[in-house]
Amino acid sequence: MTAVSLGMPAVPPPPLASRRASRQIMVGPVPVGGGAPVSVQSMTTTLTADVNATLQQIAELTAAGCQIVRVAVPSQDDVEALPAIARKSQLPVIADIHFQPRYVFAAIEAGCAAVRVNPGNIRQFDDKVKEIAKAAGDAGVPIRIGVNAGSLDKRLLAKHGKATAEALVESALWECSLFEEHGFRDIKISVKHNDPVVMVRAYRQLAEACDYPLHLGVTEAGPAFQGTVKSAVAFGALLAEGIGDTIRVSLSAPPVEEIKVGTAILESLGLRERGLEIVSCPSCGRAQVDVYKLAEEVTAGLEGLPVPLRVAVMGCVVNGPGEAREADLGVASGNGKGQIFVKGKVIKTVPEGQIVETLIEEALRLADEMGAELPDELRSLVGGATVTVH
């Protein structure tokens, strides 16, 4: 029988545009730019001087899939903690420096993988560029020129009237030119704004004006929901155009949540191999099962499953069979029962009360066949063990 295409997206979908050509820098062992995969990073929320707490949070970020971590360095106590953190961290550490240029040199000496400088608030920054360029160049440490709308140089604010896209780009390119005068080009740039529209305009201009790798970010994006929406809109627009080499989602939430959102954005654009993906319908008057409950229970039951698996949880016979058939695993529900699909074929029909248990068992079986290293709590369920649904 001839296969019929249902017009479903490829898994993963192809990128929407070719990546922008850029220089490549190395942040520790992580390549940024030059065609390297887009990396996901975050920033610790601990007091950096509290070495144990900071390293614990870095360990949590590592487990969540973070690739680069940034730590704030506002005080001498934080500076003194940097050597231990840089040495023991599982991730390359970027020191985030404001106000004090001497902290830049201390961070380089401490073994940090990179240093972020804010040209808008470091005292006499332009006068220190020659020394910073030499120290960073000798140590092989890249510099991120991190321009932020909230701390833009007063001269540029006076010139442009406010923190426009043009003002952000002008600040970044000016500082780049100072480093270039001293032969230093191991640079990446960010031009962050809390308005996604201004941010997108700024990065588009920057992408046209230089070939440095770009760190994407919406600054002060807000609480989890609002920040997720802003970041997804801005990052999606730019990454779909091939712009962006590393991303940091800024949320007023635990840093691990930033990694989850950032990774999901990349997966959605085909820039990262998909992990577990739950496809579920929004429900409507046609639904004859509680789709919300089913989707939540399947998601909870498969949390931590380390495989690129698409699971469809559908509530009626209109779109349900098509979605379920195109997924790796799925259910089309109706009349108090569910048809279970695996790789496009119906393998069984089960009562509504067994849908979640069956989907979880089949997902774990597929993961096991793929050679996945399952967490102990999931591996114990492979082979038909009872699944407890809460």
Curated annotation (Swiss-Prot):
GO BP, one annotated term: terpenoid biosynthetic process
E.C. number(s) listed in UniProt: 1.17.7.3
Cofactor note (record): Binds 1 [4Fe-4S] cluster.
Enzymatic reactions: (2E)-4-hydroxy-3-methylbut-2-enyl diphosphate + oxidized [flavodoxin] + H2O + 2 H(+) = 2-C-methyl-D-erythritol 2,4-cyclic diphosphate + reduced [flavodoxin]
Domain of life of the organism encoding this protein: Bacteria
Gene3D superfamilies in the cross-refs: Dihydropteroate synthase-like, Sulfite Reductase Hemoprotein, domain 1
Listed cofactors: [4Fe-4S] cluster
Pathway participation: Isoprenoid biosynthesis; isopentenyl diphosphate biosynthesis via DXP pathway; isopentenyl diphosphate from 1-deoxy-D-xylulose 5-phosphate: step 5/6
InterPro entries: Dihydropteroate_synth-like_sf, IspG_bac, IspG_bac-typ, NO2/SO3_Rdtase_4Fe4S_sf
Family per similarity comment: Belongs to the IspG family.
Function: Converts 2C-methyl-D-erythritol 2,4-cyclodiphosphate (ME-2,4cPP) into 1-hydroxy-2-methyl-2-(E)-butenyl 4-diphosphate.
UniProt name for this protein: 4-hydroxy-3-methylbut-2-en-1-yl diphosphate synthase (flavodoxin)
Organism name: Salinispora arenicola (strain CNS-205)
